[in-house]
């Protein structure tokens, strides 16, 4: 009876295993797991549709086709359970065993498994040390392999061609044995003694002379070690029998019309069985060798096709000429098992409809159409109807719901009460793309969405659709309410600023009501209280924007301790009514633009908490909509005021362009310089017109009551929209009322002729034609961008998915030092913004008093940030994810604040995925190459000079300079800086100075704000002389190292250095002492080598002064600002690719000297004060940016080019690399105005740096050049040190995100990412065990993820009610769902 009830048991919970192992199957294992041998290729009988015996669908092997019924029909029903029918041999059991029972095919001859043969590197080839080509010759019966050399001196597994074999037989008198095909290879593999081979290979590695040999031996050793450790035998890579997949997994479905649809696998199996049976028959008949060989080769090919069709030779195609899908194809790619069914499951019941705006909803609500709610909540409604006694059976409940009786609607209202639903808008780029709301029933068929959550969903109401999902179990409802409710997601996880912020109309309304209007009705009145203002406004006595004074009770004036009288406007007092108590009036007593609203909500969240913020957000929404309606703002043609000075600016620009054209014609400048200057002139003209236009728009002139003309802030509609941040930008307005400006070609170059018209004037045909260029490119880019951005996010998620907060404090003493971010002397990001929400590493002390401002290990919150900024601290040491010592995962202290919640991060938070989403989500806003606005090119006029911003003394930092004739300092080195120091000695500004710049002020001279500090030519890289003297050319031979280039337009020529074939020729300019009587008497006092492409600026024998330009290297004509910008740049950084022309950097500090050229490369020698000098070879023609006797620091580039991240890591270490990567990625996002917190980028960089490469083995079991996880290496070292051995030494490795994902320790995660076959092949050989630590593996295995509420420590918690009365109000979910995970109650860890 027990046994009978077990039949109705629920399926078992998938939680009872803790790891999964993969390995190579032995023939015995295959046979042991099989339920019988498949002998015939037949499938089912075409008349009876019953499976053929011993065929591919045989019921005897795989189980009955119908539940509890044997094939011949003798035994039916449950009572015969477990009996084996004596007539047809079928066991009477449920038919679902046909999904799990394997069969097998015994092969007449062994065949090689194609994965181990062809998946590079070939594992069989590696073990036997045979090349893949030779191996294939043996396997496909074109050559022999020696299987037993006896004492002939031949090598084991030596490959012999047919002729060579026959010769050898005669030579060695038939003393050895050789064979063909997989059988021979199997014998060779069987003969391998792994221990002995491993020993031998280790020895070979020690003795290896060449690097290549060592690498090859290391690879072989790796394979041998893998087999040794895992207990797999090499000969198992050759199959003697093949497992047959259960028939339900390769179904045969009858279509109408008597045809069948079948899985490709059946065809593939059928070919194998046919060929196998034919081979058996031929062997029994003792057919000629050549026929048998051919049949064996065909069997090998059939098995290859079954395992991986198309891997070798042409893919076998089915009747419709389409390649058949093999077992490997079932796993691979987007439509394979991993990504289609295991990672991307579909939900079985959800709704979807168009969205419309629901302005009267509260923030936690969404409007759900009644029809949809009825369908989604069906089971709950049936349950309630039965409970209420309206119906007695489910069937009658169903009828009642179908008829939509009034009782049903009442029950529905009750069921949906406090039952959250989840709304999702595709594409879900970050976690805010799915949020929970409480449904409100509405008529109609569209879902209503709250306007404030649109930003998070990136939704608009032009026909977007959204999906509705219903959490069923109590636990999932709790999680939806506590973690996913829209009211709990006010802050963005990417940057910690509010994401629930009024936009568009709401912003406009609030902006309008907080503006001041001069001389409005009631201007200058004084009120006793805010309430009085409300009364006056309602009575129509004062205007909304009138400037008034009000006595505020809760604000005391500093002087008299009395309630202060505040100057404000009527609108701001009205806005104050919706403000929570704790938020000060000063935060809205200003013109509220969108930026101010973000700050307001932020301040409210910090001061008043979540609940008040939600209420405030809703009230702002209502107020905003109301007042934008009252404002009645619209736009018309006349709002676009074209500035009067426009034509004058354009005329003067045209004149300048003519002037430059003349200079070019006279040969004073090159074509490239001309192009750049022209572009600059127009860029500047556009800016000037835009500036004039904006000044015009932003000011109105009105008559004051006493008849004076007064300029006041404008109420121009277009200006208000842009100024408030509601819609539009300065650039768009510029195109409407200024001039459209320069356009770019699709290639990114800028077209010289700008569009001088604007949209209000209208474009002529030529201008319109030029416009289409940029506009079309924009559309093409958008399409490409979406796919690229999605792929970047996928790679990021994959690499970071196992970065989870696993402990509170790892106890590290290491961290990063953070300073303010400056660019060109401007502070782009204050130190406060960068350290907010991080944890201090050491005590932060006040530099003046020495008091502790922030104790070590404390989170730096808003108040502490203010304290640090006020104290003027410039460098702060903080804990960082990069230096976290946690072995698996990350600790909470190193991560700091959970940006979306505003407090230190919780245990189990999946910070890796959050980081990946935060970086990937704005990816679609990044550009593919260049940044356009409707195709107009934006390029800043190149900076050519530096102006001081403050008054102070000039200080040179690390500058070598010579003073030229005019008395200016000419900078002769790179990386020098100029600072301006105020009276107290503090640095007010600091600027990097380029080589060749003219500094107008000497050290310690005083500058005034606005004075020019330095100037330079941005378009050429000068080569300067440091000494005065006569010019002599060396190796500058026309036609060999130099050519005179004639400019067709100007008819003038210039001398340009070209690449010479003669390696000994090194074009140079020598400066000879001009005074023959002096000590140096005509000898060389300066020598300058010229790179390819340099233009010589001096004539031979002319006289030059110190600081003069002797040659110029033209810079590339500038494309739009960013060489590889946008998305490709971010991908390049995260993939850690070497840049195309990367700069060689020095690894040590020292003095530069030039050595003799070697192999056509220049030799640069860096000599340190102590120790060996280092030599660097630099390709000819590359410009060397250091000079003889310059002092360089480690990590400085010796030539032009971009930095190679691998070099930075090697030379400067992890922290510098992290700083470089974070800054570079941030720069791309900053250009687009996207905010991302540094810690997200750090998290990804940590994942890229998690492996090390072994340099010295010590006494460990590691191999040299082995790459492994850092913590595995640390554990191994600890083990060895504990025993008193020598630890191994390793260097950190920087892997790109794709590489890092593929090298995770979890083979399931790696296989589901890319290169599935390769990953699984390697894992099988190593007998890998997946401990299921990351998120992805657990999703694939169908378990809860080990993050958040799924952490193992919450797994076995039981929910226990304390008092009886607690039990009543909880809505009971239908039992069918609730008992799914009996021992797996989750508790929200929010209370933690």
From Swiss-Prot:
It catalyses: RNA(n) + a ribonucleoside 5'-triphosphate = RNA(n+1) + diphosphate. It comes from Geobacter metallireducens (strain ATCC 53774 / DSM 7210 / GS-15). Its EC number is 2.7.7.6. Zn(2+) 1 binds at residues 70, 72, 85, 88. The keyword Transcription applies. Binds 1 Mg(2+) ion per subunit. Mg(2+) binds at residues 460, 462, 464. NCBIfam families: rpoC_TIGR. This is DNA-directed RNA polymerase subunit beta'. The keyword Magnesium applies. DNA-dependent RNA polymerase catalyzes the transcription of DNA into RNA using the four ribonucleoside triphosphates as substrates. Keywords: DNA-directed RNA polymerase, Magnesium, Metal-binding, Nucleotidyltransferase, Transcription, Transferase, Zinc. It is an enzyme of class 2 (transferase). Belongs to the RNA polymerase beta' chain family. GO terms for cellular component: DNA-directed RNA polymerase complex. GO terms for molecular function: DNA binding; DNA-directed RNA polymerase activity; magnesium ion binding; zinc ion binding. InterPro entries: DNA-dir_RpoC_beta_prime (IPR045867), DNA-dir_RpoC_beta_prime_bact (IPR012754), RNA_pol_asu (IPR000722), RNA_pol_N (IPR006592), RNA_pol_Rpb1_1 (IPR007080), RNA_pol_Rpb1_3 (IPR007066), RNA_pol_Rpb1_3_sf (IPR042102), RNA_pol_Rpb1_4 (IPR007083). The gene is rpoC. The RNAP catalytic core consists of 2 alpha, 1 beta, 1 beta' and 1 omega subunit. When a sigma factor is associated with the core the holoenzyme is formed, which can initiate transcription. SMART domains: RPOLA_N. Zn(2+) 2 binds at residues 810, 884, 891, 894. One of its GO terms (biological process) is DNA-templated transcription. Its cofactor is Mg(2+); Zn(2+).
